[in-house]
């Protein structure tokens, strides 16, 4: 599963499952763990270790540092992530699609109250927005948002919004189809008027030019109605459409391509028509009206869009 549409559909299925069931921490909030944590961090606030100091500060006794919230629900070295935890399937989805790199980008925690020794914390997680693909300094990637809630009983005591980036490391070998030779193929010609489109293809987006009157146009035309320093206005297509017309090319040979191959004129959901190769379909089974979707082929130095059956 490598197509953008495939990934989006799989993400939607994971998201539709909703939050995971609350999972209880292995141990209650406890003083030994608090002692170890504050010593390791160097936090000398006495309310975490001295009962009298905590009561003087208005607490019923010693309290746990709020920043320890993740500590209480760690699974340990031998822990197994629950099947309904969305992080497991979402990581596997992107690993299988070649996005093997991972880095945390944002973490925002909210603490609703202090925890007390003896309280048993539970955790649940829910998948948020998944945005991509985006070109980053690390490589092409997807930003994955997750919302996590900690509870004591039915009371929310803390929550966290965090985001990770799953990416294909920049410079990693591209998976080039066997029937294509990028060194021999004719590369797309990009100009000031079409650069936005090919930049979109590189980012795995089909960008359609929007004219001054709001209508959509493809192929792009020079935007003579605006100053040349103003970026081209466009919308991002869903990438879905139907075959409006097609041809099966048998001869002559085309540099970098293996014959026969199918060239299809696709009418996109947005109403414009776009030409490209239809891949992954038996030429004998291609028909007008056939549902297709955009897919992208990343060569070492450039990218190309194509169509594939939308089954």
Curated annotation (Swiss-Prot):
It holds the Pfam family OB_ChsH2_C. InterPro entries: ChsH2_C, FAS1-like_DH_region, HotDog_dom_sf, NA-bd_OB-fold. Residues 198-295 are annotated as: DUF35. It is an enzyme of class 4 (lyase). Keywords: Cholesterol metabolism, Lipid metabolism, Lyase, Steroid metabolism, Sterol metabolism. In the absence of the Ltp2 aldolase, ChsH1/ChsH2 can hydrate only about 30% of the 3-OPDC-CoA substrate. Complete turnover requires the presence of Ltp2. Disulfide bonds: none annotated. Belongs to the thioester dehydratase family. Involved in cholesterol side chain degradation. Catalyzes the hydration of 3-oxo-4,17-pregnadiene-20-carboxyl-CoA (3-OPDC-CoA) to form 17-hydroxy-3-oxo-4-pregnene-20-carboxyl-CoA (17-HOPC-CoA), in the modified beta-oxidation pathway for cholesterol side chain degradation. Can also use octenoyl-CoA and decenoyl-CoA, with lower efficiency. The DUF35 C-terminal region is not required for hydratase activity. This region is involved in interaction with LtpA and is required for optimal LtpA aldolase activity. This is 3-oxo-4,17-pregnadiene-20-carboxyl-CoA hydratase alpha subunit. The lineage of its organism: Bacteria, Bacillati, Actinomycetota, Actinomycetes, Mycobacteriales.
